[in-house]
Amino acid sequence: MLLIPISSSSSSSISPPPNSYPSNHHSLFFSNLTFPIQHGSRKLKTLRLRANFWESIRSGFVKNNNSTQLVEPPSIVNDEEEETEPLLPVEFTLVERNLEDGLVEEIIFSSGGEIDVYDLQGLCDKVGWPRRPLVKLAAALKNSYMVATLHSVMKSSSDSDSSEGGDGEKQQEKKLIGMARATSDHAFNATIWDVLVDPEYQGQGLGKALVEKLVRALLQRDIGNISLFADSQVVDFYQNLGFEADPEGIKGMFWYPK
């Protein structure tokens, strides 16, 4: 399963079938230590992000007499120091713009909620991905640690004016235009998959915003090791977002039937 990153300087890229991995496929790891985040319900320390890549992975293990034992790492924060500040909003408006005919379009980012698999399949069709069984798509979404989406919501300007006055806001159309998801062990590591943006909305920086918001949400949950896979032509795109190829000589590897 490959990624389709979209940025203002990149065109649509099409991934090969999910069961094929070309030789120009790269593993990237998030390593930008200055990436801005808002702290969530726990106080995060920068030591974990400054550690070598494998140090945080090995932090919960210790070797003793040729055996590996699981040990409990020290708590990163005392109970009395815990913050109650909430995590990033589950849903917020990323872009709002006025269109012709008195319409207003909002691009809404969400790090939660459900996705209609038929909408996702339609989005995959638009970017040229091969179709995958709907049952497997639903299972992939269900088993993901986090699913981030971009929706376009179209409404009339009169609806916006009435909502400001306290009346109910009537949404005329809501369309899935972007998605990215992450799998995780819920403690140390996360991998980002399936980054895609509707071709009609490419070239506007929405893919960059989608990845940045997803990374922030993962960091807020104290997930420090974030990786993804990218085709060679979009490695620079992810490196500009703080990802690093082959940190400390570590390479991602794949197994697939001959």
Curated annotation (Swiss-Prot):
Annotated catalytic residues: Y238
Keywords: Acyltransferase, Chloroplast, Host-virus interaction, Melatonin biosynthesis, Plastid, Stress response, Transferase, Transit peptide
Enzyme class: transferase
Domain of life of the native organism: Eukaryota
InterPro entries: Acyl_CoA_acyltransferase, GNAT_dom, NSI-like
EC number(s) stated in the UniProt entry for this protein: 2.3.1.255, 2.3.1.48, 2.3.1.87
Chief site of localization: plastid
UniProt xrefs under PANTHER family: ACYL-COA N-ACYLTRANSFERASE, GCN5-RELATED N-ACETYLTRANSFERASE 2, CHLOROPLASTIC
SUPFAM superfamilies: Acyl-CoA N-acyltransferases (Nat)
Temperature dependence: Optimum temperature is 45 degrees Celsius.
Protein name: GCN5-related N-acetyltransferase 2, chloroplastic
Region (Interaction with begomoviruses NSP protein): 107-194
Name of the coding gene: NSI
Family classification: Belongs to the acetyltransferase family. GNAT subfamily.
Tissue-specific expression: Highly expressed in cauline leaves and seeds, at lower levels in stems, siliques, inflorescences and rosettes leaves and at very low levels in roots. Expressed in the xylem parenchyma and phloem of the leaves and root, and in guard cells of young leaves.
Activation/inhibition comment: Inhibited by the viral nuclear shuttle protein (NSP) that binds to the region required for oligomerization.
Compartments, as annotated in UniProt: Plastid, Chloroplast
Subunit composition and interactions: Oligomer. Interacts with begomoviruses NSP but not with CP. This interaction may allow NSP to recruit NSI monomers to acetylate viral genome-bound CP and thus regulate nuclear export of viral genome by NSP.
